[in-house]
Amino acid sequence: MARVKRGVQARRRHKKILTLAKGYYNARRKVFRVAKQAVIKAQQYAYIGRKQKKRNFRSLWITRINAAARINGLSYSRFMNGLLKAGITLDRKVLADIAVHDAAGFTALAEKAKGALAA
């Protein structure tokens, strides 16, 4: 059986990790063993960050909707309940965008929500 030397594969594997570690400081960029740990940790942070981004944006949208709803005399929960009863199905992202860029449109939505709550 032929002898297998793994120099090419090792070089390729090391190069892949060291390329991913570009922009890191000192040994985290130059030493394979340290760079590998740094890259793995960075990928973990990136994965977690992608999940947190969804939570953070939802929280931001709710805050913006709440602020605009209170200007129109409703709390966030009563506003959302009013929209549900009125049969208006807009997601929080769109509602927050309307609240920021179209105050008159949001006021109209708030009036419909108030009407649905009163009925």
Curated annotation (Swiss-Prot):
At the top level, the lineage of the source is Bacteria
Has keyword Metal-binding?
Answer: no
Q: Which InterPro entries match?
A: Ribosomal_bL20, RIBOSOMAL_L20_CS, Ribosomal_protein_bL20_C
Asked if the keyword Ribonucleoprotein belongs to this entry, the reply reads: yes
Question: What Gene Ontology molecular-function terms does this entry list?
Answer: rRNA binding; structural constituent of ribosome
For biological process, the GO terms are: ribosomal large subunit assembly; translation
Q: Which SUPFAM superfamilies match?
A: Ribosomal protein L20 (SSF74731)
Query: What are the UniProt keywords, alphabetically?
Result: Ribonucleoprotein, Ribosomal protein, RNA-binding, rRNA-binding
Please provide one cellular component term from the Gene Ontology annotations of this protein: ribonucleoprotein complex
Please describe what this protein does. Binds directly to 23S ribosomal RNA and is necessary for the in vitro assembly process of the 50S ribosomal subunit. It is not involved in the protein synthesizing functions of that subunit.
Q: Which family does it belong to?
A: Belongs to the bacterial ribosomal protein bL20 family.
- The identity of this protein, by name, is Large ribosomal subunit protein bL20
